[in-house]
Amino acid sequence: MSDLDEDLLALAGADESEEEDQVLTTTSAKRAKNNDQSLSKKRRIEVGSVEDDDEEDDYNPYSVGNADYGSEEEEEANPFPLEGKYKDESDREHLESLPEMERETLLFERSQIMQKYQERKLFRARGRDMKEQQQRAKNDEDSRKTRASTRSTHATGHSDIKASKLSQLKKQRARKNRHYSDNEDEDDEEDYREEDYKDDEGSEYGDDEEYNPFDRRDTYDKREEVEWAEEEDEQDREPEISDFNKLRIGRSFVAKFCFYPGFEDAVKGCYGRVNVGTDKRTGKTSYRMVRIERVFLQKPYNMGKFYTNQYFGVTQGKDRKVFQMNYFSDGLFAEDEYQRYLRALDNSQMIKPSLHSLSNKTKEVMDFVNTPLTDKTTDEVVRHRMQFNKKLSGTNAVLEKTVLREKLQYAKETNNEKDIAKYSAQLRNFEKRMSVYEKHHENDQSDIKKLGELTSKNRKLNMSNIRNAEHVKKEDSNNFDSKSDPFSRLKTRTKVYYQEIQKEENAKAKEIAQQEKLQEDKDAKDKREKELLVAQFRRLGGLERMVGELDIKFDLKF
């Protein structure tokens, strides 16, 4: 080995530590610089991701109500655990003892409460499922981020060691040529920048996984796939009584929506619980589950607060009948009514409706109910209602006046001068018609008063006639011979014996007195006749008359 080689080795060995320190210092400085750049990039990315998340949260349908579910961990108690209508057996007995109208009203209110309870229960269950899915997705993202950062760290460390050794080798060989060494230094710096940029770029991609909106969309897609699969499984089952109860049309629904446009199409295919009378064996009201086929227009009838001419044409199997809408109950279908309807379908060889068709019809009814009211729709509702309810008093007047006021208020809020003038004039005309109607009604009070007086007079006359008829009937009954009717009640009188004896004695004494009086009268009459006869002889020549009446025969012979 020559002295030159030894000098080179010595120089290489002596400068090795310095070069290593220099290389390590340069590498650490560059790494710190690159780390600062990557951290600044990460900060910018994280800020952007937070903003993106905030923007996405505004449109996230699954984030609604999540904050409320944390405080509602405890399950809400079922308000009506017995058949979904009663609190207990005593409550059932109390409801069945009430009048039909009051019972049906309470059952309808309880059905609304149960529907809200089921919705809250479903929302809580969905909220819990969403929170669990979000937690699982977050854990998966954290684990994926940890693995990605670990891989990035290992790769970066390996490349740094390799680059440091390579730079040392190059710098040892660059002692012979300074120019080549300078060029190699520039290449090394470019290599360091490229490798550090690749490392930072890899870390940025790792950070991109934290805020990538497509990950959220993929999560939603997975959830939708799961929910769609659950819905398909749900649609495969047989329909139950609860599914039919969702399509039940009652008296309250009819009273609210019967004048709305599209009501006939909405109720077609729904189900109802119709009152068919009283059961002779139990004495309770009997109901039947029927399917509404169409709406008929016939003679108007009273629905309670208004008149309508709409009738429901219903079927149970092959049996068809037309009912007034006020015969439909707001109560839920009972199990025996549901089974009776299924037996009617089987006897008629008709197919039971599928759950898919029931769900579609339920959505159609909900769309009809949730349709917003427009000016045109409101005018049509009022026009249909006024067809058989033309009086200005009562509910119709209140409804029409309320509609006009709402239209006027909306016109004032929108500063529409044309509509303000229009609805103000209509409201004034309506109030004028109301005042005219009230005055006319006051003028009719006199006629009503006269009619009332005439009615009262006729009522009194009828009462007197009835009283006389009852008196005549009573007299006839007194004169009626009870012996002719063997089934009549025998009338008895209390008999006091000493009074009867006294009466008999009085009668005998009276008879004796009458006889004595007759005898005295006879004696007095005979006495008067004798006195008269004596007087005739004395004063009226009675002797001469008697002599003249004597028939004396003389026989004279000469």
From Swiss-Prot:
Q: State one Pfam family annotation.
A: Plus-3
Cellular component GO terms held in the UniProt record: Cdc73/Paf1 complex; euchromatin; nucleus
List, in alphabetical order, the Gene Ontology terms for molecular function in this entry: DNA binding; RNA binding; RNA polymerase II C-terminal domain phosphoserine binding
User: According to the UniProt record, where is the region Disordered?
Assistant: 1-107, 119-217
Its assembly, as annotated, is: Component of the PAF1 complex which consists of at least CDC73, CTR9, LEO1, PAF1 and RTF1.
Q: What is noted besides the main data?
A: Present with 6510 molecules/cell in log phase SD medium.
Q: What is this protein called?
A: RNA polymerase-associated protein RTF1
- Organism field: Saccharomyces cerevisiae (strain ATCC 204508 / S288c)
Provide the taxonomic classification.
Answer: Eukaryota, Fungi, Dikarya, Ascomycota, Saccharomycotina
